[in-house]
């Protein structure tokens, strides 16, 4: 079993953006770790700041041409939430372990478009009951710049 304190810890740090982190000090390297760094679903490789009403709790990864993201995405303003997980193979030359993968030109645009498609669907979907998202509001280490 996981304690409530441990659960809150995991949720907070899965949703914290690099620019909100004290340790490691990702905020010191904004060219390398921008606000939506590793938030592939919905934002791909964009370096824009995330809207204040959206928070993404995710575990991303990449290895041997596979780009992976598993996310719980919440929009506090519109009171929508959804889970989305995707794995895409981004290796057009078929050679593994050559560090030549198509993450930026195939994988991340796909992830962004997939996330946007589901987000737009959820915005239009009729809900019988809107979720209470207040348990997912956290105070982060640093305020975004």
Located regions from the model:
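Structured C-terminal helix/loop/strand segments within mature extracytoplasmic catalytic/sensor domains
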Residues: 1-145
